[in-house]
């Protein structure tokens, strides 16, 4: 176990937000993968006991013994009690900037590990400033970004660098993550978080600067480096022989990867570079597709910057928190990512990362679940803080993702 300071606790994992769409997917996965009479002790939590009972009933008779815990996101006493009963809290209650702060504080104070799906850079920065030092004292591992943003990217860099070092004796001086293909929809929670993030950035220039700065999640005094702003336009990549467009999640993922590198003590060197983009194809059609993608993303961000149009988007266009695709669409989904690393001598090292379900729901719920189980059950380095998936879990998490969550990490010739 990774946290001797926790002592004996009633549960290994408590799922907060179990009545939401993603929370229910997590509950289904834990039941299917770990059952209720095995080594993993888990419970469901939320603010409405009746809805919790409905979720438990929907899981079938095999879940009849799963404990239910009532805890509202703003009830500090209930949250503290919840955290003291478990090794890990897994939460799907977002936007986290609105609903997550008190739970993080309770986890830190009780030395309880924590994982979420937050992609809200401004809020993660706030949690680092408020709780990193205290979490180091209590041993609590506070791990944000445990879904499609940013597990495949953060763990992917960890994987490629170690594979490169093992094969060539040196780390890559740069890595590019290219999204080759995805099938699926962004979760309602992710979209709600994105809308709130844009809203807050319009109201507070400091938040806007945090979103733009490439090293804004790095430790204080370590926010300089070679990387600039994330890709903003269509660019032709000679190494991929294709056009690329901006990737909507790059603004989160790239900062998480850079924080991982900083927390690890800069093993790849302080001149290490990292970027992300979407492959749009070759020739004129690739350029045109990339241009349409870029303009479409820009249009959404522009419309979301103003209250009236943002409200219209949330009401009529974007999926809402608690909504999601049916099971067939989840199973039909997938993602396929390509990494291109460059060694100091110019040698290219490539890897492929894939997921077997839609990134927004099916794969994300499995990744988040395995992060929680990893924090609860695996032998991890015994230190706390506001961490990243790669720094907090590293190799044990890759093993779990490969074995249980349908992800692949492969070095390519």
Model-derived segments and spans:
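Conserved glycine-rich Rossmann-like NAD(P)H-binding loop of the short-chain dehydrogenase/reductase
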Residues: 35-51
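N-terminal Rossmann NAD(P)H-binding glycine-rich loop of SDR-like oxidoreductase domains
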Residues: 11-34
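A short, Lys/Arg-enriched amphipathic alpha-helix followed by its capping loop at the start of a domain
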Residues: 29-39, 264-266
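Structural motif
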Residues: 12, 87-88, 113
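Conserved Rossmann-fold cofactor-binding substructure of NAD(P)-dependent oxidoreductases
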Residues: 70-86, 92-98
